[in-house]
């Protein structure tokens, strides 16, 4: 039986595990740490939200799976928010989908769109799932520098021109 997992072997170390270990070591040394690594809540959920969740959980029509794209009214509300915020028109039936979260959404997008041999342009630095999602999908990564003193658009153009075959996807944050 083959117990090798080549996609997992291609994954780089997870930056939040590394920073987590560094934080724990610093705390064990007695250092005061302010954690900016992830947006984890540091307070209780507001009571009105808890009450609404309890109310919804008691409704019999909420005891099942949602439609695969997500509830239409929620998709419509998302599109309305993009219109207000960015003046962008989106079609809730064709251009909006509800996911469990951003990590799962990006990973599933790359699984759906990318294959072995495809290349994904990823800004560097970037959020870890931008790299992990492409690797899990079997794609190759082309890093595009986003650092002070480097013209991102020139780097992006160079990456597009020099990548063969042409990139399949570009991640924007």
Give short role names for the model-derived ranges.
Residues 124-126, 145, 173:
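Nucleotide-sugar donor-binding loop of glycosyltransferases
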Residues 2-5, 9-100, 108:
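N-terminal small-domain helix-loop-helix segment of the aminotransferase-like
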Residues 112-129, 133-134:
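Conserved PLP-anchoring active-site segment centered on the Schiff-base-forming lysine
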Residues 147-173:
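Active-site phosphate-binding strand-loop segment of PLP-dependent enzymes
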Residues 136-141:
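A short helix-loop-beta submotif of the ANL/AMP-binding
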């Amino acid at each position: 039986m083959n117990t090798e997992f080549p996609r997992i072997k291609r994954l780089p170390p997870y930056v939040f595990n590394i920073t987590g270990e560094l934080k724990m070591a610093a705390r064990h040394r007695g250092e005061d740490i302010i954690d900016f690594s992830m947006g984890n809540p540091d307070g209780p959920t507001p009571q009105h939200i808890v009450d609404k969740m309890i109310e919804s959980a008691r409704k019999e029509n909420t005891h099942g799976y949602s439609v695969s794209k997500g509830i239409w009214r929620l998709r419509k509300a998302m599109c309305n928010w993009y219109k207000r915020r960015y003046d962008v028109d989106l079609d809730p039936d064709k251009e909006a989908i509800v996911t469990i979260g951003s990590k799962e959404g990006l990973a599933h997008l790359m699984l759906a769109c990318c294959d072995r041999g495809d290349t994904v342009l990823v800004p560097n630095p970037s959020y870890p799932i931008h790299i992990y999602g492409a690797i899990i999908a079997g794609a190759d990564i082309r890093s595009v520098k986003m650092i002070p003193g480097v013209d991102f658009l020139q780097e992006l153009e160079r990456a597009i021109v020099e990548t063969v075959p042409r990139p399949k996807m570009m991640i924007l944050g």
